[in-house]
């Protein structure tokens, strides 16, 4: 449970002990966030999503930073292209990520002197099992009209593949990206332009 700081610290310590340290943290944790317009979101759902996303990220980074300072490591956060161009009905996904983006900039600025780099990847629509499940549910956000309208916004005229995201994360975590910090890299097929 990423909302429990004791549990997160224990897991981080166990991983560091097993592998002799930690040099990269990739935060790709997430859950099925409902697509809702702002006016339709009740406060309990809002608080639950913010707690899981923002506080979960904070707990992970707070427990991992000492290890990253030792290894001069890297943080890679999986974010959303909705940061660049807001998709209506996606505030529950985008709002916490906007907060986390600023926390990453803070880490990049404050811990750069310790060799820690902090970056994110802003995902567009990625062709995954979750995406197909949402389409099959045939809700109003993922119907054929939505599919066509999104496809029309993409410069590459296709959805992304998981390996394209993974390759970007591996690059950002590697020494090849050793002079990149505080940035959000779009992997969105040109959605943001």
Q: Over which residues does each language-model region extend?
A:
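Conserved NAD(P)H cofactor-binding loop of Rossmann-fold oxidoreductase domains
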Residues: 28-34, 190
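C-terminal substrate-recognition "lid" of short-chain dehydrogenase/reductases
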Residues: 67, 158-187, 192
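Catalytic loop of short-chain dehydrogenase/reductase
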Residues: 74-100, 104-113, 125-126, 152
């Amino acid at each position: 449970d990423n909302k429990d700081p004791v549990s997160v610290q224990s897991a981080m310590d166990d991983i560091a002990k097993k592998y002799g340290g930690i040099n990269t943290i990739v935060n790709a944790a997430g859950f099925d966030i409902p697509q809702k317009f702002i006016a339709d979101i009740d406060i309990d759902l809002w608080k639950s999503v913010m707690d899981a996303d923002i506080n979960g990220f904070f707990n992970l980074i707070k427990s991992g930073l000492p290890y990253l300072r030792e290894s001069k490591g890297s943080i890679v956060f999986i974010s959303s292209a909705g940061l660049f161009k807001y998709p209506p009905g996606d505030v529950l996904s985008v709002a916490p990520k906007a907060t986390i983006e600023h926390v990453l900039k803070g880490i990049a600025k404050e811990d750069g002197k310790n060799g820690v780099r902090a970056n994110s990847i802003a995902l567009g629509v990625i062709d995954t099992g979750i995406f197909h499940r949402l389409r099959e549910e045939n809700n109003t956000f993922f119907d054929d009209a939505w599919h066509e309208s999104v496809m029309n916004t993409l410069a590459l005229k296709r959805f992304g593949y998981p390996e394209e995201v993974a390759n970007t994360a591996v690059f950002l975590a590697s020494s090849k990206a050793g002079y990149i910090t505080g940035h959000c890299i779009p992997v969105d097929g040109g959605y943001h332009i």
